[in-house]
């Protein structure tokens, strides 16, 4: 695992000066000689919006809804500009007369702005006319402050000297004082710039770093919990970043050290750490510069499958060709032989996507000359670096490739660590580690089963929570909308319980699977306790997760995209979310890995499954937040000197498509929100089981080629040498067979874990793979047991596959027909029975379908539907059978003399049984046809309400014909059945 910096499209020009970065809006504010400007950090075009000013600007900030802009011109007042109508209002701090100066100002909500002076805290509410009204103040001596908006609330840390910190919690039109605490360490060297506010593993932390330790304080509304400090591996000046719930310490020794709080706590509980020694980091190596984002989907998919796709395709295709040429009935048992037109490579990349990958490779070869760990770098929380010398912005990210090198390949450490990550590269690394464990047998079956249980327990909890929350939202959505509107207009009491809503507009999904936003409300009561406890209580941010519903992934993805579009047009500052990656593919992605279109950055993963169906694909959505469209009028001291930035969805998509030459494929803030990865059955098949199975096929093909070469080369050798070679070949074949059986045990263990953990939506491709493995090893009795006891669930692909191997193992044919019956597919059963000459059984099923499911019966009937029954019965040289079949369809008015296809069988019936055996109704129709043909008339058969293709009804037939409404009414048929 390594720390990487990736250059962003944004460049700060020479005539521009960086002012601040707004983490909530993901916007960079800068000033120029004539005013200031703002730019969206994720905009590939880096489109700027400029505002001119005739005064020198100290700082500028935008409201969360991008409706107002607050500009500081002096130490005593700020100017608030309405960006839609251009009105402005100057607000002066209350204690200006006592020489109070502004230390900072912040938008706590879209309607509240906070002024922090060296003498007081002043919270103002915005009026409809743009004026400010003081709603709450607190007189306190302040020397410095740090403000953070995280998880729908703001927290201000005030420093008044020494190491004492006073936090405040802000909500609409009010704020509360939280328990005061002291920062440990050297008080003389305390620097407020080393104080950070972040969220780690769903908990809210205040983090302070000095040259030797990292001090962490978990914050709740009740009190502050001190966490045991982390001793830094390399002491000295440093800077701290937070990426993917990890703490990255950039040392002045040009080393980036990565710490995971949960891993450290696990080691402490196990007693594996020494109090006097530094904490063991996840990695400690220099950061690297990369022009390719290691968490880009195209990059990951290409790296995950490039070796496999280049080696397996020709060999698998040769296996398919051999099977087809030899007409081997067992060829259907191979997953790769199910569809010869599809490639067996797990990835089929389009030309557009391949061009992107090629461009990234060229850019990787042409890295710019950048001095890493420059002294002029500005480290901006949470994970950005600004280089003032070049004006380049970098994003700090993680590449989880070769993570096992840093954790000594301990699956008990590596897999839980990767499960708690959110980046795409972590999901690919986790799948790669599981594949390595299985392929090289580095763990026992019981150990692998425990790994499966860990994965599937998380999958079940998230899926179950998703179903519950979806139902809750669908029921309470109207009521919640009304309650939210009322809550925004009312003030909250200080002594009442506070509800922290943890959903947000910065959420988005990536399923290699899965992700709707969810809301978990945490109710806590504020107290004045200032004690520091040793164990945590209620989290300051609560719990909020988003999950993937594996049962309805496509519908979920549509809802997610609609929700993203709404959030882009309706910014909401009161929300933030914690969601999970699942089915993912995409997924799973998720979950799984899902489809590509021209407006998204994604790739198509198409693998030949045992059923011949292609794998699902992952969709990675990208979009940009809206920027204000209205400019202020000329009456303001600030004039808009640029055209409006068009950030609608269509133009954003076009920008993404037309900017293939960018060094960095930018994900928007929504896609970089906290999203735990999920591993489902689709992911396990696509990236673990199926690659191993195809490798076994490749090895098997190589062994066959060696055997053929040995036979050709050893024709002139003596008998002893031939016997030795045969023994060696038998040993190699036995090894392959054992490996294949081991894979069977591994797959069965995974299916068992899915079942025991109540995971639904298991991939049919997984069952197809298991069936193929059992057939390859001639384990038909085991396959029979799995089908008989419903270990393998019903699906059309499974039923078709069982039907295809009926010749190899006849008992499975009946099991496949039973599965088709449970799936309500009588047409397939009837066709199968007719192909095998079992006409009577097919007619009985047709009659049973008519009695039990009239709709399915009507769907089966076509004008020529009886032809296949008549053809099958006439080819069996059984006159009694042909008579019974013909009479059945004649009785049900399904014989259509006017249709040319029936002429052959009507003539055959008359030849064998004479015209007297025909019903009077059919004789009348035939006579009418003959008369009309001689007179030039035409009769067109019409389908009546009862399903008959004759104009006449069965009620018009003779009583004798009506009485023969059953096959069993014919003595000859009863005799033939016996």
Swiss-Prot record:
GO terms for biological process: autophagy; regulation of autophagy. It is found in: Lysosome membrane; Late endosome membrane. Pfam families: RMC1_C, RMC1_N. Residues 582-591 have a biased composition (Gly residues). Keywords: Autophagy, Endosome, Lysosome, Membrane. InterPro entries: RMC1 (IPR040371), RMC1_C (IPR009755), RMC1_N (IPR049040), WD40_repeat_dom_sf (IPR036322). The keyword Membrane applies. Residues 496-515 have a biased composition (Polar residues). Residues 311-363, 474-546, 558-665, 703-727, 955-978 are annotated as: Disordered. One of its GO terms (cellular component) is late endosome membrane. Residues 311-351, 479-495, 516-539, 592-663, 710-727 have a biased composition (Low complexity). Residues 735-908 form the Mic1 domain. It comes from the Eukaryota. Belongs to the RMC1 family. May have a role in autophagy. This is Regulator of MON1-CCZ1 complex homolog. It comes from Dictyostelium discoideum.
